[in-house]
């Protein structure tokens, strides 16, 4: 999908890429942005570290599920559909220039998807919390994020149209993966 996006971006002389969806869609937009700006190198070569990207088209994100935090992170995960191998690439070139984060765009999600998003936010937060480095401030922020996600997740799963809980989850998801907590 990302390779097709690169072809379309090159064909249309795109100067910007927008990912509207969740983490996978936004990560795909990031890959397209890197691929189009570094053509003719195949994007997978960046994710396998065979090559280093030096440029990227600007990326914007429109978030429709609170989960991965890709809307504010410098990382992107891709899966090579031919091999099934999944890899991540962290570079400031990946960080979106802007993110539209309107909780109303998440209110049609089924409760199961809301719960999956809550779990994803918690995992990103715990990844950073349980690292060997001690930092009282970032640990306290991570603990606050976990408390918030647990409390608001319970509300959101029962009532995905609760603006406040969906807003809190959206904010927590972004903070869990933007580098603030390690």
List each model region and its residues.
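General structural feature for long, well-ordered alpha-helical segments within catalytic domains
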Residues: 1-5, 13, 28, 118-121, ...
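Short glycine-rich or small-residue beta-strand-to-loop segments that form or flank ligand, phosphate
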Residues: 17-20, 60, 176-177
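General beta-strand structural signal in soluble alpha/beta enzymes
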Residues: 18, 28, 61-62, 101, ...
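Active-site segments that bind and position negatively charged phosphate/pyrophosphate groups
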Residues: 128-182
């Amino acid at each position: 999908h990302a390779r097709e996006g690169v072809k379309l971006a090159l064909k249309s002389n795109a100067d910007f890429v927008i990912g509207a969806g969740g983490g996978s869609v936004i990560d795909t937009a990031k890959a397209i942005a890197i691929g189009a700006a570094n053509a003719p190198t195949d994007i997978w070569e960046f994710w396998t570290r065979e090559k280093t990207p030096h440029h990227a088209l600007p990326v914007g994100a429109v978030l429709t599920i609170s989960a991965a935090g890709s809307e504010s992170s410098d990382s992107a995960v891709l899966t090579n559909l031919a091999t099934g191998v999944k890899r991540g690439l962290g570079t400031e070139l990946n960080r979106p220039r802007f993110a539209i984060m309107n909780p109303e765009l998440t209110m049609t999600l089924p409760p199961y998807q809301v719960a999956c998003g809550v779990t994803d936010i918690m995992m990103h937060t715990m990844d950073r919390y349980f690292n060997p480095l001690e930092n009282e401030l970032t640990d306290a922020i991570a603990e606050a994020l976990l408390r918030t996600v647990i409390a608001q997740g319970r509300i959101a799963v029962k009532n995905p149209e609760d603006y406040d809980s969906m807003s809190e989850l959206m904010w927590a998801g972004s903070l869990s993966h933007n580098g603030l907590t390690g």
